[in-house]
Swiss-Prot record:
Belongs to the endoribonuclease YbeY family. The gene is ybeY. Its main location: cytoplasm. This is Endoribonuclease YbeY. It holds the Pfam family YbeY. The keyword Ribosomal protein does not apply. Its EC number is 3.1.-.-.
Length: 137
C-alpha cells in the first residue's frame, strides 16, 4: 500500500501538499515510502488513541507508529487538527505552517528520529526548519 492521507474532520486541508512534504522528508532522509497512512483527526480520536495505545489520557499534536522492517518506510501517524489550530495561535504562526511542521515531525519519527531529550528535540527542530524552508523557497 502506498502513502494514503485521511482527513476525518470537516476542516479542509491541502492533502496534495501534505503528501508532497511526507515524500520529501522520507526521500531526503534516505528512505522509500512503503505503506504510510497519515490520519488527520480531531481531539476525540487522538485522545482515544493516546489512551488506548500509549496509556496517556490526554490530547497531543501527533502520535506516530513506525513498522519499518527492511528498506521501505511503513507506519502511520495521527495529527490532531484541533491541537494544530490552538498551537498555531499560541506560537503566532499560520495553521498551515504548524500543520506542515507537525507533519514533517511525524515523518521524521517514521525515519527513526526521536525527541525524548532536549538535544534530540533540538536536532528534530533543525530538520523541521530545513524542510519548512525547502517548501517555502
Amino acid at each position: 500500500m502506498p502513502l494514503q492521507i485521511f482527513n476525518t474532520t470537516k476542516r479542509t486541508i491541502d492533502e496534495t501538499l501534505l503528501a508532497e512534504v511526507i515524500r520529501l522528508v522520507i526521500g531526503e532522509e534516505g528512505g522509500a515510502v512503503g505503506s504510510i497512512e497519515a490520519i488527520y483527526c480531531g481531539n476525540k480520536m487522538i485522545r482515544r488513541i493516546n489512551r488506548d495505545f500509549l496509556g496517556h489520557d490526554y490530547v497531543t499534536d501527533t502520535i506516530t507508529f513506525g513498522y519499518n522492517e527492511g528498506g521501505e518506510v511503513d507506519g502511520e501517524f495521527y495529527i490532531s487538527l484541533d491541537v494544530i489550530e490552538s498551537n498555531a495561535r499560541r506560537f503566532g504562526v499560520s495553521f498551515e505552517d504548524e500543520l506542515l511542521r507537525v507533519t514533517i515531525h511525524s515523518a521524521l519519527h517514521l525515519m527513526g528520529y526521536d525527541d525524548e531529550t532536549s538535544e534530540l528535540r533540538a536536532a528534530m527542530s533543525l530538520r523541521e526548519d530545513h524542510y519548512l524552508y525547502r517548501l517555502r523557497h
